[in-house]
Amino acid sequence: MAETEAGLEVEEPTEDDTLPSDTVSLSDSDSDLSLPSGVEVQALSPERLSGESQEDSGPDDPPSHPTGIPTTAVQPFHLRGMSSTFSQRSHSIFDCLESAARQEPCSAPQTSVVDNCSFKRPVAPPSQTPARSLSRVHGNTDPTRVHPVPDYVSHPERWTKYSLEDVSETSEQSNRDAALAFLSSRSQASPTDYVPFFNQDPSSCGEGRVVFTKPVRGSEARAERKRVLKKGVVSGAGGEASVELAHLAGPEAEEWSGHQGQPEVVVPSEAARPESSSGPIGMKTVGFHGSKKRSRDHFRNRDSNPEGPGSERGPSV
């Protein structure tokens, strides 16, 4: 422990170590000067550096004359307690930066100023500037595209040239007259026996237009029936023919007519009196019934007796 304390000696600040603010340059990251390992960071003034150089120099070397005017150059940091290799590396890095800044011409604009120290932008490499300037001045260096020759120029025999130099300019009225004359000639050339389709008549009156109507088959059938009946009536009146309803005569018709009470129709019949063919014609009753079909099992005569002699009944058990 004693050797370690002897190796790391802390020097008290003296008047020579106190420097004005314009000669001290610290970075933003070096806010605290105290290090955990006890290493002290000090900024050395030109006078201190000159004194140290005299102490380091031998007795044979001529003493360097101290300069009373302090230099404005910013001195690098000096870390005590570090190895010489690290110090040399740090000095070489800062020397390269300073030499690069000195090589830049003073005419370059300043980008920013921090702590009264100017930082200048490095000059662009000279190889890029001429290439850009040449490309801008000369523009596109590609060869110009040659347009092909049109076919009507290279082969005029394939084309026919039309010109309107001989045609005089006409007015609107002359154009209208020419159009009307052309239409009239076309209408005269059309055939007269032309029959248009239905609803295709070009005239406004619409003559010959086909009109579709709903077919009436039932009415035509009724008219035909009426016409046939009229012909039959006329022929009957001329020949004095009588209409006979003998097909409706019979016992069932008599029963139905007597039950319904409908009028009786007298029909002459020669078979009623066979003894006298030349005498008066006999009369026969005929009954009419409706179109509705009825079962005749439910009808019976009023005068008929179910237990009469005409009825047949089986033996009672």
Curated annotation (Swiss-Prot):
- Interaction with SNRNP200, as annotated region: 146-300
- Pfam families in the record, alphabetically? TSSC4
Its subcellular locations are: Nucleus; Cytoplasm
Is Acetylation included in the keywords of this UniProt record? Answer: yes
Ranges where the record places region Hom4: 198-238
Q: What segments bear the compositional bias annotation Low complexity?
A: 20-37
Q: Could you tell me one molecular function GO term of this UniProt entry?
A: molecular sequestering activity
Q: Which residues carry this modification: Phosphoserine?
A: 57, 64, 83, 92
Region (Disordered) location: 1-78, 123-151, 247-317
Biological processes per GO annotation: spliceosomal snRNP assembly; spliceosomal tri-snRNP complex assembly
One GO CC term, this protein:
spliceosomal complex
- InterPro entries, from UniProt? TSSC4 (IPR029338)
What are the boundaries of the region Hom3? 147-183
Annotated keywords: Acetylation, Cytoplasm, mRNA processing, mRNA splicing, Nucleus, Phosphoprotein, Spliceosome
**Stretches with biased composition (Acidic residues):** 1-19
PANTHER family in the record, alphabetically? TUMOR SUPPRESSING SUBTRANSFERABLE CANDIDATE 4 TSSC4, U5 SMALL NUCLEAR RIBONUCLEOPROTEIN TSSC4
User: What subunit structure does UniProt give?
Assistant: Interacts in a RNA-independent manner with distinct U5 snRNP-containing complexes, the mono-U5 snRNP and the post-splicing U5 snRNP-PRPF19 complex. Interacts with SNRNP200; the interaction is direct, excludes recruitment of C9ORF78 and WBP4 to SNRNP200 and negatively regulates its RNA helicase activity. Interacts with PRPF8; the interaction is direct.
What does the UniProt record say this protein does? Protein associated with the U5 snRNP, during its maturation and its post-splicing recycling and which is required for spliceosomal tri-snRNP complex assembly in the nucleus. Has a molecular sequestering activity and transiently hinders SNRNP200 binding sites for constitutive splicing factors that intervene later during the assembly of the spliceosome and splicing. Together with its molecular sequestering activity, may also function as a molecular adapter and placeholder, coordinating the assembly of the U5 snRNP and its association with the U4/U6 di-snRNP.
Q: What is this protein called?
A: U5 small nuclear ribonucleoprotein TSSC4
The organism is Rattus norvegicus (Rat)
